[in-house]
Amino acid sequence: MLELERIANHLQDWGAICNDASFAYPHARCGLLREALLRANAIAFGHRLMMDAVIPGGVAVDIAAEGAQAIRGVLDAIAQDLPGLVRIYETHASLQDRVVGTGVLRAELAARFAAGGVVGRASGRAFDARHALPHAPYDELGITPIAIPEGDVDARARIRIAEIGTSMALVRRLLGRLEPGPIHAPLPQRGGEGIAAVEGFRGEILTWMSLDDGGLIRAVFPRDPSWLQWPLLEAAVEGNIVADFPLCNKSFNCSYSGVDL
């Protein structure tokens, strides 16, 4: 589910970057591919965005009988379209003029703010929670973070493109490993506290939680990766023309609501 969500959102963000550079075709194609993926999600998990599918101890529903076939089918469609879209993106002169060298985030700032996700990896910070803090099944998949040093809008787009391919390969591997069995485990009814890190499509999502003696939530604090990325967007737009702000903003795609959690 994490990798399917990553593919869908990276497609959306890549297309939106092109659209903010006044080049609508990739936006339209990425939108069609994302829609096809969301429909496959609905077939497999009962919800286009897979909402309420993850519960404490596991998942709420098992993948539908026809779910794996639906997901493989849409991955095949994306894999067929992706090379052509990348070629158009890389060879369209006016688009490249807008994204290359625009909104540069310096590597030292990315490191100082511990920026994760696309923002950090596009500025040379090779941190990925799937690699650094792996939970199952990532501890068996051997994730290698993709990082490049340029730090501009183009770099953030290229990281997304590369991660779409990586995530598609991971989904195929995971579908091949699925076996029948329980879909969630019973939780102990006891107190305690802990913290977890999950690599979302924007970066690492941290959640601290404290339980009372009955196992009920006493306190919880989620931290969205956008907390560390909004100040860096401010630094990245310095020296750019006003017309390039939408490009910079969309290439970061920080969450407005995430910082209010």
Question: What are these model-predicted stretches?
Answer:
Residues M1-L261:
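Active-site bordering "gate/hinge" segments
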